[in-house]
């Protein structure tokens, strides 16, 4: 595979990993909270009540009047609380997202022992 065909990786990360991925492409998931005064999207990036909110800049607008939205964002981490969006995928959310299970899966996918199960390499 040559450099032009190489697929760009957007590793899934957790809120506590944001600082170590500054300037890098990542995938984050969360519940849409609102749009702030700067037309940025605010998502809850972890279990409710932990105040793990991330601002998503440079995104296409989400219909917040529709059903509660769950989103997956691919973009670049600008700092501990801001991701510049390159791609946004919306999901209708009927049940609360299980961030505890998701967190365990992310830790497994990043472990030396099991990471090969989660990549094509």
UniProtKB/Swiss-Prot annotation:
One of its GO terms (molecular function) is DNA binding. It is found in: Nucleus; Chromosome, Telomere. The gene is RPA2. Keywords: Chromosome, Nucleus, Telomere. Its main location: nucleus. Belongs to the replication factor A protein 3 family. Disulfide bonds: none annotated. SUPFAM superfamilies: Nucleic acid-binding proteins. It comes from Tetrahymena thermophila (strain SB210). This is Replication protein A 14 kDa subunit. InterPro entries: NA-bd_OB-fold, Rfa2. GO terms for biological process: DNA recombination; DNA repair; DNA replication. GO terms for cellular component: chromosome, telomeric region; DNA replication factor A complex; telomerase holoenzyme complex. It holds the Pfam family Rep_fac-A_3. Component of the replication protein A complex (RPA), a heterotrimeric complex composed of RPA1, RPA2/TEB2 and RPA3/TEB3. Component of the telomerase holoenzyme complex, composed of the catalytic core (the catalytic subunit TERT, the telomerase RNA template component TER and TAP65/p65), which is associated with two heterotrimeric subcomplexes: (i) the replication protein A (RPA)-related subcomplex, composed of TEB1, RPA2/TEB2 and RPA3/TEB3 and (ii) the CST-like subcomplex, composed of TAP75/p75, TAP45/p45 and TAP19/p19.
């Amino acid at each position: 595979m040559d450099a032009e065909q190489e697929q760009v990786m957007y590793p899934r990360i957790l809120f506590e990993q944001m600082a170590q991925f500054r300037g890098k492409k990542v995938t984050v998931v969360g519940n849409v909270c609102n749009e702030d005064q700067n037309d940025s999207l605010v998502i809850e990036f972890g279990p409710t009540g932990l105040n793990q909110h991330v601002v998503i800049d440079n995104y296409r607008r989400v219909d917040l009047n529709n059903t509660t939205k769950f989103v997956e964002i691919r973009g670049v981490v600008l700092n501990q609380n801001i991701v510049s969006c390159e791609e946004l995928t919306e999901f209708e959310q009927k049940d609360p997202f299980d961030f505890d299970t998701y967190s365990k899966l992310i830790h497994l996918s990043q472990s030396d022992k099991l990471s090969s199960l989660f990549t094509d390499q």
